[in-house]
Amino acid sequence: MRIAVLLFAIFFFMSQVLPARGKFKEICERPNGSCRDFCLETEIHVGRCLNSQPCCLPLGHQPRIESTTPKKD
């Protein structure tokens, strides 16, 4: 019975395939953040990851706010 449990554990851990780049995606302290060399135009820089890359957080759907300064007549 121990051999069956051991074989199950070995096959279970071997089935966990690494991503194509050979390492797990590192995430930053924010739940939706990701570590990149440079943040995209639709992301903001919110901190640093453990590998010293910027932690980028997607902006999402932000409403566009028009300027409220009065126009000169």
UniProtKB/Swiss-Prot annotation:
UniProt xrefs under InterPro entries: Beta_defensin_dom (IPR025933)
Keywords tagged on the record: Antibiotic, Antimicrobial, Defensin, Disulfide bond, Secreted, Signal
Gene Ontology biological process terms in this record: defense response to bacterium; innate immune response
Disulfide bonds: C28-C55, C35-C49, C39-C56
Gene Ontology CC annotation, any one: extracellular region
Signal sequence region: 1-22
Subcellular locations according to the entry: Secreted
Record flagged with keyword Cell inner membrane: no
Tissues of expression: Specifically expressed in testis. Low expression is detected also in liver.
Main location: secreted
One Pfam match: Defensin_beta_2
Family: Belongs to the beta-defensin family.
Functional note: Has antibacterial activity.
Protein name: Beta-defensin 108B
